[in-house]
């Protein structure tokens, strides 16, 4: 009988440990968010991040306008605080990085002095760090 109780406790403990491990692994998966909205992208982390986890993020914006005669600028803000700008060319790849958590808001904006967008694509990658 003691052997059977010991066996049951071992299985219960193993099951509990596996559940905890699965939760930890699930919380370590990177999250990819893509947007093809032209000229702007609003990323509300309430929609996709997990509470209680801090994330490192990278936002990459690829943008082209229709002619070399024009210029553009891309900006990224976290909770209305500007994190950086990139611009003065008709073709750009802009990269912004930082840390955030659920509830934070990322806002990508652009300015162009003419032409039309031939490409505007945003990819954000959120990597759990704690």
Predicted features, each with a name:
Residues 1-9:
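Long, low-complexity or tandemly repetitive, helically biased scaffold regions used
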Residues 12, 16-18, 22-130:
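Extracellular jelly-roll beta-sandwich "head" domains, especially the C-terminal globular C1q domain
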